[in-house]
Amino acid sequence: MGMSYIEHTSSHYVEMNQNTVDLYLMKNGKPILADGSGYHGNKDMYAVFRDRDPRLYHTVIPPYKVKSGKGDYPTWSYTDNPADREYIDIMGANESCSNPGVGMKRLPGQNWSASLVPEIPRLGTGAFVTCRSGYYVWKNWDNWETSFNNGNLNTADKPIFKIEEVLLNEAEAKFELGVFDQGVADKTINKLRDRAGVVKMVVADINDSFDPNRGKYYPKGNESGILVDPVLWEIRRERIIELMGEGFGIYDIRRWRMAPWFLNKPATGLWMSKELSLIHISEPTRPEPIS
């Protein structure tokens, strides 16, 4: 997953596929396919996001729908469906699309000229804030600037080396040295989980059945792959999630020798039903179908 400095236009071109979304834990610290995870299923985008690691909400725009008002920079109001505001209530309401100045990420979103984005997902081509998978990456999106309504670039800081990477480097190195334990987890990974609002890693609870979809690595000459150690897999998951969208992915995948596991899969998007239209009024062409 790469970086994008343009996140309010049709030139964005950075999105996430379902396989990557599925890597995010539940807030209770369990993988989505684990017993007792509480995963709500993937047949409804609201359900996909419900009770997940909050870092998902800050990386991919959560789903919502509002009613548009009138004017060049329209106001908006809630729909009659309570589900449509679930993630607006979590992220905070973007009360004024013309001059936000209210925080890093608020809903509903707006394009570079502050025009309201009335719903997410926006599937297809030809309009702002659209993508084909339904999972629009907004890692660098910000609503801090009170004069934001005339620009398509983001002003979020881009630190090159930060404490999160230091902690994740230490956790992975300690495992490779054979000394990763609960004490190390508490000083590294659990510092990040506390901040994110995810239940802490308990090393003793992580066994071969902890994640039924655990990844494989591929030593030279081995085409079938070998399951990654379950604890190491959780350390790597934390690195993937915390550093998502910051340019680390391709280097980590190569270093871990896991490219076949990550890349040799169909790139699917959100579950589609016939009731959900792929065509928005502002879009002149029919998009390619999502598998």
Residues of each region from the PLM?
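Acidic/polar-rich alpha-helix caps and helix-coil junctions
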Residues: 1-282, 286, 291
